[in-house]
Amino acid sequence: RRYIRKFKKEENFILMDFFCHGVPSMLMWKKYIKEVKKTIGKITYLSWRNKVINCHDMKTMIIDNEKIDWHDSYNLLVKGEKGYYNSRLSQGDVFYRLFLSDTCLGKACYEKCKFKYDRSSADIRIGDLWGRMYKHNEDGVSAAVAFTQRGWELLHECNLEIVEHSFDVVAEGQMKEMPICDELYKRMKILLQRDDLDINQIYRQLLIALKYRKVMNRLKHPVRTMKNILKKIGK
């Protein structure tokens, strides 16, 4: 926005950004692709958030028309010379498990991201509307936030069904702050750089580290831990 404002062109643009969890680190992505290639050979096609699976026609990918639940939008389809590989978070795919652990994001996500949650330089922000409000909606609901009057006017000029909610509802499932660059992140970076470890071995190391962190956190807060135990027993 500062750039177009500098040249007095701001009125010629509508700026849009996205609710963003982060981007996977290149180290993690390369490690994952290396593992996938063992199954399907050289990769020739890749579709992020693929909504349709086809097990038969590798050209169109849509013969079976198996609709993917929008809640399962963490979904990646990779086509290779020997077949295809469908990666879904709901099926426990290691790529998404690592990504959502916030320990394997790109460096800039930890150091330079200024636009989490309600911070933006755009007129409009879009994304998926996660959260309790539409938890049982099977068709999918898009979130659109107008940060400026121009953004608000444009949204209402579009041929859309608009239901207004508070920002807290719209952004309920979104990250509020940058992820923390802690010791676990540094540890994962070292593991991802090792040629002798595949991505599944690295994920197992992460699980061990997370379990250790959970136990230590409980030991550091015995009163809170006991209250939680009693609450579970009470149920």
Language model region names:
Residues 2-3:
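Classical protein tyrosine phosphatase
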Residues 6-18, 39-40:
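A short alpha->loop->secondary-structure connector
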Residues 17-20, 31, 109-113:
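Functionally engaged cysteine thiol sites
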Residues 19-23, 103:
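Short, amphipathic alpha-helical segments
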Residues 41-235:
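Long, compositionally biased charged/polar accessory segments in the mid-to-C-terminal portions
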